[in-house]
């Protein structure tokens, strides 16, 4: 019985971050990404090598990075003011949009 409870608790711990990341709406994120495209491009692959590829990144990683830029925990002269006005919903939507694009998570053949 204890093993079953432990397994359920472990599963909940593992799956909870995935559920939180899945809350974003990729379609809304695409509409909200207009400012992002100036550096990260329409396809999320960056317009130059100095800009990070967002396409295919994990949504939870993208959301965490944006929240850290917004709070000042992560510093970047360009990203801090970009993330500052974003709501949690905006961040979830943007993260879902960029995670939905072909990119880093796309298997190669």
Feature annotation, model-predicted:
Residues 35, 68, 97-100:
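Residues within well-ordered alpha-helical secondary structure of globular protein domains
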Residues 15-33, 47-50, 103-109:
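Electrostatic cytochrome c docking/interface patches
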Residues 39-45, 99-103:
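Detector for the c-type heme attachment site
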Residues 35-38, 76, 88:
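Mobile acidic interaction elements
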Residues 26, 30, 45-74, 80-85:
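Gly/Gly-Pro-rich "capping" loops immediately C-terminal to redox-active cysteine motifs
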Residues 1-10:
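Bacterial N-terminal signal peptides that target proteins for export
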Residues 34-42, 94:
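The canonical Cys-X-X-Cys-His
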Residues 74, 84-109:
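C-terminal capping alpha-helices of c-type cytochrome domains
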């Amino acid at each position: 019985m204890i093993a079953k409870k432990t397994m359920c608790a472990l599963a909940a711990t593992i799956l909870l971050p995935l559920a939180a990341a899945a809350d974003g709406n990729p379609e809304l994120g695409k509409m909200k990404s207009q400012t992002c495209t100036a550096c990260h491009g329409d396809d999320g692959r960056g317009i130059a090598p100095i800009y990070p590829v967002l396409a295919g990144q994990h949504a939870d990683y993208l959301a965490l990075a944006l929240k850290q830029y917004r709070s000042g925990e992560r510093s970047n002269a360009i990203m801090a003011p970009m993330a500052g006005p974003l709501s949690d919903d905006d961040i979830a939507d943007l993260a879902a949009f960029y995670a939905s694009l072909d990119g880093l998570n796309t298997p190669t053949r």
